[in-house]
Regions:
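Phosphate-handling catalytic cores of nucleic-acid transaction enzymes
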Residues: 1-200
Length: 200
């Protein structure tokens, strides 16, 4: 699991002439209580956890500065929209404001990507958004898989939909996420491995 997490964002594997896909793995380890599941998990994932911690610390000043830029951008964007609304009510021309708005939208700052590779308790919806916005490669890793299988995302009403989403992410396929209340988006070229341990 840890090895696939390290390489899945770097290369694909060609299994046959027309079969190419990610190196991502889904693994489930079944072990009795006291068989050191957490110890083994920590041993193999320590390097990945150390790397992502180092990256977070190194990128923190940039992330903080970018968050400020995004707040300023949102304030300016909101101000221009309010100005358009106000000028329209008064019957004034808004061409210049629309030009300013278009220019501002072209300059929208994006969050600084920070490697957040190891995840545990994730809803599929949040995982999809994180792969799009934060980092396009991740692994759901847990030595207590009961927390994953027993989560709200695995209730009878949503289990098939959520497992299908995870399967598409593992396969490296393209995934359209449609939303009514939020922005819809497309996930493409993202990578997901799953490494779970559970007691029988």
């Amino acid at each position: 699991g840890a090895l696939s997490l390290c390489v899945q964002g770097l290369a694909n594997i060609e299994r046959a002439g027309t079969l190419t896909g990610p190196t991502s793995l889904f693994t489930l380890t079944i072990a009795d209580s006291g068989e050191r599941k957490s110890t083994v998990d920590n041993y193999f994932t320590k390097g990945v956890r150390d790397y992502q911690d180092e990256q977070r610390k190194a990128l923190y000043p940039q992330v903080k500065a970018r968050k400020r830029e995004i707040k300023v951008w949102k304030t300016r964007h909101s101000g221009l929209l309010q100005k358009i609304k106000s000028e329209t009510k008064q019957g004034n021309p808004i061409d210049e404001i629309k030009t300013q708005l278009a220019k501002l939208e072209d300059e929208e700052p994006r969050p600084i990507p920070v490697p957040y590779l190891i995840r545990s308790d994730e809803t599929p919806e949040h995982l999809a958004m994180a792969l799009r916005v934060e980092w396009p490669s991740a692994g759901i890793v847990s030595s207590e898989a009961g927390a994953v299988f027993g989560s709200h995302a695995m209730n009878p009403e949503s289990i098939m939909r959520n497992l299908s989403l995870l399967n598409i992410l593992w396969d490296g396929g393209e995934l359209q996420i449609g939303r009514v209340t939020r922005e819809s988006f497309c996930l493409k070229d993202v990578r997901l491995s799953v490494s779970l341990q559970i007691q029988p």
